[in-house]
């Protein structure tokens, strides 16, 4: 029987039984002593008769005395053999209970001690710094014979430059055992990006017709493309593959390698100091990437590979839009900045005068909280929206302050986020570009939907969460900043009520299917069904002229009721309970709903919220009934949710006893199906329009349920082609085994010079 020792804290003793359940058949010895030296730790292991030891306390730093900095989370999963004893550094074992992935990770890391034979063999890190062209040429010749090549760069912010690149060649043995792990070796080289000769040699390696491996390679490739060195045969990416396998886990290289390889130690803080240290650090990155990819090929399930084959092409299709960006209208930017500075300064002066403190800062949560307490609301503990909502409804003065804080922060956010100098790209020559760049990331969410953030080049902004337009007629829309190039129009094609339609077909709720497919306004139809008001009093489908010549225009006739139905539908789809719906809608809106619906005076706000949710459940009984039970059953039986396109999510949490997990998993199928459909359309638009109509079309970005693009004036056919490609039919099977074909319709807007001025093109 294998014996291992655990060095834990006294606070972790309550989780020991859970720990024992992860390693049946293993003798587990534990100590809460805190050894002061490595020798003392060795003695503890030998006294326990153990072959290995895991450490969850700060004493683990004794195992890595040369570490420049140390945190337990960074080194978790590191496995070291010291004086013939295997040591594993782990996080606090309470995470077995307190985090969804804690149980899985603890079992994985402990197996480095209990069953080392099941882990793939990690080849030695054979490394060379090629400081001269002759050394680089010799490395190039070796790499020509590699079966795969992993690469990684280190960048310098000031010049948008990379100063070193590493290559790890993977050489697979000719003779492999019938069973067992891949036999392979690696050779790692780093090339300084120091002059044109070295640049040419780097380019030659990248142009070798050998499959390439990266970790989050869009970042590396952005700089390589910038410096005229695009790689060929970029097929493999460890971040995308790990997301395809375990979407709920981190995608950092250090985490992935600790999870995938046994004999690995955290190295991400070893690149400080000399260029030699930086180069070796870069080499370890590409070596870790190569070895991790090989471990994936050895043990990853087929469904993870199927996911990868869906996700990775989307990443490739993101590169061109990221480098294309969107034109920035400098005049609109100036007006936007001027308007919001005026609002910001006016609100700050008004609030400061009201409290009698010239230096009062409404952007400081500490100062706001002090004022809230001074106004008698000492039970308010923070300045989050739900807390400020509670504060505001207690007195008209509170409401005035709360709305003032909100307006100040909104204007200040526009100034700091959208009109800052760093929005523009400043190139290595110091030139500023009137363009907005950004990143689009297919591995940013658990559902497969693209995320966004600032550009790889330290500029730009997150393009998906653009601030909504103000009601004030004088306000300048943030979207006015985003413009089409000369001779082009901007266009946007949007999947209409995509998540509601997805939920209807996935759940098999026939009432909801009828509602989304009948052709009437969905939210007005819901308002009628939820609250018993005739549809015709809420929405007018067609414009008409009566006998007296009076024109009745099409559109919404009762916005408050329609907006209320939208909030209730959103809350129910995301499985909110009364308290969360109250926080989401806000106290004031719930009070409005109470009087709008003539609900009893004696009802409290939570009862109003419960009533609102009950109206959804009565109208669509399957969504929060049989459908939720089906989702819980799938996870209980397989730990997976499989969508109509085959995209599979591994689920670590138990939705039966975890409300947060249940909410996440209930929302997943419709969000993921929407993402998969949008990604299919994205790939088609990229390959069939963007790459073919290069003079007349620009693919810009995914924006949640829509795709933003530019088309040359006179080429409206390309805009309609985008709309048609967005409409992807998918065969969906509901929990009752009934199959239906879902095709979400796509709306189209275009013919606008800016994003704010798009016109309906239906």
Language model: regions and residue ranges:
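Conserved catalytic core of nucleic-acid polymerases
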Residues: 319, 323, 378, 437, ...
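Short active-site loop/helix that positions an aromatic residue
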Residues: 158-159, 218-230, 243-245, 369-376, ...
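Conserved catalytic palm subdomain of right-hand nucleotidyl-transferase polymerases, strongest
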Residues: 149-151, 235-240, 482-499, 581
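Conserved RNase H-like, two-metal-ion catalytic cores of nucleic-acid enzymes
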Residues: 2-8, 12-30, 120-255, 259, ...
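A common structural junction motif
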Residues: 724-735
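A polyanion-binding, active-site-adjacent surface
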Residues: 1-119
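Conserved "right-hand" nucleotidyltransferase catalytic core of DNA-directed polymerases
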Residues: 115-187, 259-260, 267, 274-474, ...
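Metal-dependent phosphoesterase core characteristic of DEDDh/y 3'-5' exonuclease domains
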Residues: 65-77, 82-87, 91-96, 103-106, ...
């Amino acid at each position: 029987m294998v014996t291992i020792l655990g060095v834990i804290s006294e606070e972790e003793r309550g989780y020991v039984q859970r720990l024992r359940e992860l390693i049946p058949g293993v003798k587990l010895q534990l100590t809460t002593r805190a050894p002061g030296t490595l020798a003392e730790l060795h003695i503890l292991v030998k006294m326990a008769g153990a072959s290995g030891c895991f450490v969850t306390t700060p004493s683990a730093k004794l195992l890595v005395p040369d570490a420049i900095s140390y945190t337990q989370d960074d080194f978790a999963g590191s496995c070291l053999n010291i004086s013939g004893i295997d040591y594993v550094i782990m996080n606090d074992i309470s995470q077995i209970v307190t985090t969804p992935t804690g149980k899985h990770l603890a079992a994985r890391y402990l197996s480095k001690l209990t069953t080392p034979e099941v882990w793939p063999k990690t080849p030695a890190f054979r490394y060379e710094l090629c400081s001269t062209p002759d050394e680089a040429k010799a490395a190039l010749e070796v790499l020509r014979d590699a079966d795969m090549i992993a690469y990684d760069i280190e960048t310098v912010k000031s010049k948008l430059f990379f100063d070193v690149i590493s290559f790890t060649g993977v050489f697979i043995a000719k003779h492999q055992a019938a069973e067992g792990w891949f036999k392979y070796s690696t050779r790692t080289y780093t090339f300084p990006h120091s002059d044109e000769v070295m640049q040419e040699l780097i380019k030659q390696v990248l142009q070798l017709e050998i499959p390439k491996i990266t970790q989050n390679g869009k970042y590396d490739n952005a700089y390589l493309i910038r410096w005229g060195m695009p790689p060929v045969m970029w097929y493999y990416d460890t971040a995308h593959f790990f997301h395809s396998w375990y979407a709920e886990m981190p995608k950092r290289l250090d985490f992935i390698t600790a999870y995938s390889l046994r004999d690995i130690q955290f190295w991400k803080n070893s690149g400080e100091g000399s260029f030699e240290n930086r180069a070796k650090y870069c080499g370890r990155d590409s070596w870790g990437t190569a070895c991790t990819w090989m471990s994936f090929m050895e043990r990853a399930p087929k469904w993870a590979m199927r996911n990868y084959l869906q996700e990775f092409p989307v990443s490739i299709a993101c590169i061109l839009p990221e480098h294309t960006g969107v034109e920035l209208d400098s005049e609109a930017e100036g007006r936007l900045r001027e308007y919001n500075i005026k609002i910001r300064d006016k609100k700050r002066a008004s609030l400061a005068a009201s409290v009698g403190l010239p230096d009062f800062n409404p952007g400081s949560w500490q100062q706001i909280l002090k004022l809230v307490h001074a106004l008698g609301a000492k039970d308010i503990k923070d300045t989050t929206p739900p807390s400020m909502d509670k504060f505001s409804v207690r007195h008209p003065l509170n409401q005035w302050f709360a709305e003032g804080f909100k307006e100040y922060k909104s204007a200040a956010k526009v100034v700091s986020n959208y009109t800052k100098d760093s929005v523009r790209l400043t190139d290595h020559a110091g030139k500023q570009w009137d363009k907005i760049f950004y990143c689009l990331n297919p591995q940013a969410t658990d559902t497969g939907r693209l995320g966004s953030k600032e550009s790889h080049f330290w500029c730009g902004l997150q393009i998906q969460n653009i601030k909504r337009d103000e009601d004030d007629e004088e306000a300048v829309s943030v979207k006015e900043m985003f413009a089409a190039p000369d001779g082009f129009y901007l266009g946007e094609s949007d999947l209409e009520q995509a998540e509601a339609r997805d939920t209807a077909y996935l759940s098999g709720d026939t009432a909801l299917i009828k509602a989304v497919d009948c052709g009437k306004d969905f939210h007005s139809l819901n308002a009628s069904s939820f609250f018993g008001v005739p549809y015709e009093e809420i929405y007018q489908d067609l414009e008409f002229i009566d006998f007296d010549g009076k024109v009745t225009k099409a559109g919404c006739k009762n916005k408050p009721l329609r907006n209320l139905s939208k909030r209730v539908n959103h809350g129910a789809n995301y499985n909110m309970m009364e308290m969360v719906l109250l926080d989401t809608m806000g106290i004031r809106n719930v009070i409005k709903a109470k009087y709008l619906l003539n609900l009893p005076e004696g009802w409290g706000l939570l009862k109003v919220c419960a009533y609102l949710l009950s109206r959804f459940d009565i109208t669509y009984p399957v969504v929060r009934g049989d459908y939720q039970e089906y989702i819980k059953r799938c996870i209980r039986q397989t730990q997976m949710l499989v969508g109509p396109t085959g995209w599979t999510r591994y689920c670590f949490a138990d939705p039966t006893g975890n409300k947060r997990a249940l909410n996440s998993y209930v929302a997943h199928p419709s969000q993921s199906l929407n993402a998969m459909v949008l990604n299919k359309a994205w790939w088609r638009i990229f390959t069939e329009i963007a790459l073919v109509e290069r003079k007349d079309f620009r693919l810009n970005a995914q924006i949640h349920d829509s795709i933003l693009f530019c088309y040359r004036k006179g080429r409206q056919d390309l805009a309609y082609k985008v709309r048609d490609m967005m409409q992807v039919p998918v065969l969906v099977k509901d929990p009752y085994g009934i199959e239906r074909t879902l095709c979400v319709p796509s709306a189209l807007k275009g013919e606008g010079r800016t994003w704010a001025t798009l016109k309906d093109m239906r």
